[in-house]
Amino acid sequence: MAAAALGQIWARKLLSVPWLLCGPRRYASSSFKAADLQLEMTQKPHKKPGPGEPLVFGKTFTDHMLMVEWNDKGWGQPRIQPFQNLTLHPASSSLHYSLQLFEGMKAFKGKDQQVRLFRPWLNMDRMLRSAMRLCLPSFDKLELLECIRRLIEVDKDWVPDAAGTSLYVRPVLIGNEPSLGVSQPTRALLFVILCPVGAYFPGGSVTPVSLLADPAFIRAWVGGVGNYKLGGNYGPTVLVQQEALKRGCEQVLWLYGPDHQLTEVGTMNIFVYWTHEDGVLELVTPPLNGVILPGVVRQSLLDMAQTWGEFRVVERTITMKQLLRALEEGRVREVFGSGTACQVCPVHRILYKDRNLHIPTMENGPELILRFQKELKEIQYGIRAHEWMFPV
């Protein structure tokens, strides 16, 4: 599909972007073009994983990558080239000051052998917003998506077709200023790499996780950058994840503020399915107030639930005090995280102030989680046609 043809899709999907945040040279009209894409096929193809061979997340890469360079004169020609190491100046601003951002999305191969991306325009919107926040160069989202489509098309034989598998797509944009000054970069590099990945829950099982909720650790704050997908948001979480493991938990429930608001689970958005204090059954997730990353799966679950019209769907602050009270009164049905890697992940225990809180997610089916997973699978693998899927 040519880039120009994507305009009809974007007319329905486009989100507002602060185009002028970093000055006029960041206008999207100054962009690389998919029509200029250069192609260099590898002469040394990698060995593809065999049938049934485990696909560990982020460990196996396809034969090719997309690369586009930028300087203060504009974007260079995009090129698909053999997968290779990068050459960076030791003073590169991405290495010293975390002038870097990334995205994560998946392509799925259906039984019809058609490969489809899941709502990629939302990732393009979010990536551009992240670029604006870091004063990195803007780009035309249509052109980048078409370049990504072409890359996947080149490496389409790497897209696994076993149940629950997919091709993970990782676009990255970094500042590449060869200087130790903290400033707006005059050089940047955009690249995209691909990884075949296995099922998050092997065999279709649903395994719940336990969470450490410690208010001493804060992932993001109002006025910060928690709502952008920046590399600098993730590195500091590794220590807290290790602390969770030491305390017998698999993930971290990130709290915020003096009232201990629930924000995210690990790198996932969080949902609570309960009967609210007013007696109404509802699905609630924290609002996009600058602390929450606007997840693609998060938005998809909200959209699906709104379409069903069977219970109230709301974006509202949730505090630990409210959750504790709801647990004591038996009003909580399910708590779960959502994200590109896992889609929907149930929670069965929260360690909070040295107290283990049992979450009855699994005792309740988990009815809603399984329904979400079933619908997502049918859409992503082309079992039923849906406007969310973008054919490669």
UniProtKB/Swiss-Prot annotation:
InterPro entries assigned: Aminotrans_IV, Aminotrans_IV_CS, Aminotransferase-like, B_amino_transII, BCAT-like_C, BCAT-like_N, BCAT_family
Essential cofactor(s): pyridoxal 5'-phosphate
Pfam families named in the record: Aminotran_4
Modified residues (N6-acetyllysine): 321
Record CDD domains: BCAT_beta_family (cd01557)
Domain of life from the UniProt record: Eukaryota
Residues annotated as transit peptide in the record: 1-27
Entry binding sites for substrate: 168
Subcellular location: Mitochondrion
Keyword entries, A-Z: Acetylation, Amino-acid biosynthesis, Aminotransferase, Branched-chain amino acid biosynthesis, Disease variant, Lipid metabolism, Mitochondrion, Pyridoxal phosphate, Transferase, Transit peptide
GO biological process, one term: L-leucine biosynthetic process
Molecular function, one GO term: L-valine-2-oxoglutarate transaminase activity
Keyword Mitochondrion listed: yes
Gene Ontology annotations for the cellular component aspect, listed alphabetically: mitochondrial matrix; mitochondrion; nucleoplasm
Tissue specificity of this protein: Ubiquitous.
Sites of N6-(pyridoxal phosphate)lysine modification: 229
Function: Catalyzes the first reaction in the catabolism of the essential branched chain amino acids leucine, isoleucine, and valine. May also function as a transporter of branched chain alpha-keto acids.
Assembly and binders: Homodimer.
Involvement in disease: Hypervalinemia and hyperleucine-isoleucinemia: An autosomal recessive metabolic disorder characterized by highly elevated plasma concentrations of valine and leucine/isoleucine. Affected individuals suffer from headache and mild memory impairment.
Family the entry assigns: Belongs to the class-IV pyridoxal-phosphate-dependent aminotransferase family.
NCBIfam families (alphabetical): ilvE_II (TIGR01123), PRK13357.1 (NF009897)
Full protein name: Branched-chain-amino-acid aminotransferase, mitochondrial
Gene: BCAT2
